[in-house]
Amino acid sequence: MAELSTVARPYAEALFGAARDDKAGLAVWADLVSEMAQVAANPDVREAMADPRLDDKQRSEVFTGLIKSQLPQAARNFIELLVKNDRLLLLPVIATQFVALKNRHEGTAQAEITSAFELSDAQVKELIAALELKFGLKLKPHVSVDQELIGGVRVAVGDQVLDTSVKAQLARLRDTLAA
């Protein structure tokens, strides 16, 4: 995976630079890049893009035809570049890196919050407020439920994980007793 990230990084940075300078705004581009990544991740699309009977122009036309959103010329050019360099199927990795660049630019981060039970809106707001103080970033929460946690929450912000779940506490206790 590290190799794919390395190959995808220059494309993500170039796309981010173009999006940052576009009057449409980063949010519009983030949605567009996400849609392109979803299309590229589709197994049928991956198979079609690997068809040796299609030339680069046909691959570009087929792919752009599958995108429901209106594509600006810069996005069409980007798709053509990816097809020409045989990198179109890297779009999911490029999209992940694009979002990371966008978040860094905006001083925000994605907070993956996993709870043992459904959290109310008030609980999520309170948790996000505390986490924003801890991490020093504006956080965008994505909340999910995993009953295997037994209780508590697990929060991942970037590569940092804060796990206060009962499951994690029991695992630490088990490790301490086994030592």
Swiss-Prot record:
SUPFAM superfamilies: N-terminal domain of the delta subunit of the F1F0-ATP synthase (SSF47928). GO terms for cellular component: plasma membrane; proton-transporting ATP synthase complex. Its main location: membrane. NCBIfam families: ATP_synt_delta, PRK05758.2-2. F-type ATPases have 2 components, F(1) - the catalytic core - and F(0) - the membrane proton channel. F(1) has five subunits: alpha(3), beta(3), gamma(1), delta(1), epsilon(1). F(0) has three main subunits: a(1), b(2) and c(10-14). The alpha and beta chains form an alternating ring which encloses part of the gamma chain. F(1) is attached to F(0) by a central stalk formed by the gamma and epsilon chains, while a peripheral stalk is formed by the delta and b chains. PANTHER family: ATP SYNTHASE DELTA CHAIN (PTHR11910). F(1)F(0) ATP synthase produces ATP from ADP in the presence of a proton or sodium gradient. F-type ATPases consist of two structural domains, F(1) containing the extramembraneous catalytic core and F(0) containing the membrane proton channel, linked together by a central stalk and a peripheral stalk. During catalysis, ATP synthesis in the catalytic domain of F(1) is coupled via a rotary mechanism of the central stalk subunits to proton translocation. This is ATP synthase subunit delta. It comes from Bordetella pertussis (strain Tohama I / ATCC BAA-589 / NCTC 13251).
